[in-house]
Amino acid sequence: TRDSHLTDLEKLGGVILLLIYLALIPLCGAAILNWAGGLLGFSIGPALRQTIWFYLLFAAVALVFHRFLFVCAGTFTGSAGRSFQTLGTALIFFYGLNEILFRVTHLLWGHTVNLNDTALVSLDLLNAAPAATVLALVVLAPFIEEVLLRGFLFGWLRQHSRAAAYLVTCILFALLHTWAMAGDHFTLYYLLIALQYAVPGLIFAWAYDRSDSIWIPIAAHAAVNALAV
């Protein structure tokens, strides 16, 4: 079984940060920052709230996992050829599988757009604060999500079951990107979006599993988001 490269302290930090990202921020993030803004005497809009949380999480993840990130950087540079090959293969498979799934959903349910790209670029925040939103989508979110979901959770679960590692992280990744949009109205449309988000979830997990460097799925995730924006 491949080593997760994680210390016990990093695993504890990963649990806490993942719970903050998956539960605390979606449920209470707006209320917390609105309360803080009230104390300081100014209003914090949705775009600024997103930026603040992403910066805070980025800093926390970098601090908690700095040793792990350094180890993965060594793996990347030590096997540069394999690393770049994995990155290229991941991008090819992402767009190939995404196109296949798009055509299948179009054939079965008649959708005429790529749901993955639509879910990403139709965010109201992109119009409200384009620079901050692009920074979050292309830099901050890929770093945070890949370190927490792939580096921490996938790496930890892989020590016990590779199949469980793929399954759990793919489901979490898909739900993370659809649940907030769907709210209480999780219709077929959002189920199809979740299925399409399972594609990058699978590809990014494979990229980390094959390269053993978290920088590869981070780069792949950033590239996919940049092209979608």
Named regions from a protein language model:
Residues 1-9:
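Short, Lys/Arg-rich, polar N-terminal cytosolic tail immediately upstream
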Residues 25-32, 97-106, 176:
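C-terminal TM-helix exit segments that contain a strictly Trp-centered aromatic cap at the helix terminus
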Residues 63-73, 207-210:
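Structural signal for the C-terminal ends of transmembrane alpha-helices
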Residues 39-46, 71-141, 183:
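Juxtamembrane helix-loop-helix connectors linking adjacent transmembrane helices
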Residues 8, 14-17, 44, 48-51, ...:
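Membrane-water interface of alpha-helical transmembrane segments
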Residues 10-28, 88-94, 166-172:
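Alpha-helical transmembrane segments
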Residues 99-103, 128-229:
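Transmembrane helix-loop-helix hairpins at the membrane interface
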Residues 16-69, 115-124, 132:
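Alpha-helical transmembrane segments in multi-pass membrane proteins
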